[in-house]
Amino acid sequence: MLCKCAAGALRALRPATPRIGVLNLTALSASLSANRTSWSRWTHMRDSSNAAWTPKVPQTPTWEPVAESQLPPATRISPDLVDKLERLALVDFGSEEGVDCLEKAIRFADQLHVINTDGVEPMDSVLEDRELYLRDDTVTEGECAEELLQLAKHTVEEYFLAPPGNIPLPKREERSAMLKDSEF
């Protein structure tokens, strides 16, 4: 349960009009058939009979097969790169299965190389062509600091206590040395 201040702030930050026609694609995965991966990219077919109304989000997706020859060579991840990614992301995925999953995800994203972007200007923001309405920075309710602080898991005096920063994983050599010396 949020206090009145927090609930009011959340209401004020909601968009005035909800998004219309947001496309939900749940099946964005490569289909495996006979140990061969087939790739497809999403395209939009516009109905020219209704030219007056052009939605920003396509109404019906279609899939266009992408030939394996159109994709760049498959990316192979070296053990050194896996080690560096593990330390940066603080995630242990160095198993053969984890590396295989990462290589498949990169291969799926390789389809972006096929898209023709000639003459397309890069965007600074997705919303750069719209006027963004900001609410005035005025206090509508007050004296709710105590209520907000009660929602915090840890506080020191009248401040929220942030959790400690991430502790980096040791390098591969250090991890193997630690495992050799451990009792497990």
Swiss-Prot record:
Keywords: ATP-binding, Ligase, Mitochondrion, Nucleotide-binding, Protein biosynthesis, Transit peptide. Its EC number is 6.3.5.-. It is an enzyme of class 6 (ligase). Its main location: mitochondrion. It comes from the Eukaryota. NCBIfam families: gatC (TIGR00135). This is Glutamyl-tRNA(Gln) amidotransferase subunit C, mitochondrial. It comes from Danio rerio. The lineage of its organism: Eukaryota, Metazoa, Chordata, Craniata, Vertebrata. The gene is gatc.
